[in-house]
Amino acid sequence: ITMKTAFILCLLSLCLSSTSHGQEGKMFTVDKDLSSSMLNKIYQDRDGIIWIATEDGLNRYDGAKFTVYRNEKSNPHSLLNDYVRTLYEDKQGRLFIGSLNGLQIYDRATASFTTIPMYLSSGASIDPNIATILERNNGEILIGTSGHSMFLLETRGDSIKARQISRFISSNLITYAYEDRKGNLWIATGDNGIFRFDKNNQSKHYSGE
């Protein structure tokens, strides 16, 4: 484990312990605690649980112990892929997990994962590489992918799916999406700079050249 990783996790432990019965902070290690030192994202949910997305599994820390989730070939409700890229909790408290080949929601009641079907604009089903997830102020949830541009989450009752949208940008390699205080949507790409969209959906392109 790198010193940077160890330092971050030690700080997280101290932060969590400040609200969990006065526990003392401690250092976490890959050998005993984490599934991997290659961390992609660290997130603390509304219940105080710390989630750590790594290149070898999803780690959950409740203040007392770690639980590691990995893909199980015989279990359709396990992680889609051990390489977890991103995590996002929406306003409803739903925890989304984006991996190398698809999007899932974590079910806290059963400690299992439900895969969200994703469709290209052609109607074909796909399991894309998820790079970023964002809930906008208007309630829209956008999913950026590495290879298939942007998707919009559609929820009807208990049915959830995501469909590709093409109205945004001329790039398939999305790296990050962000909405600022003014409602401007910023989308960073891996091959065509940054795009900004205002509330009227007027765009501006920053190529970096």
Short names for language-model regions:
Residues 1-209:
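Carboxylate-rich, polar loop motifs that coordinate divalent cations or form catalytic acidic clusters
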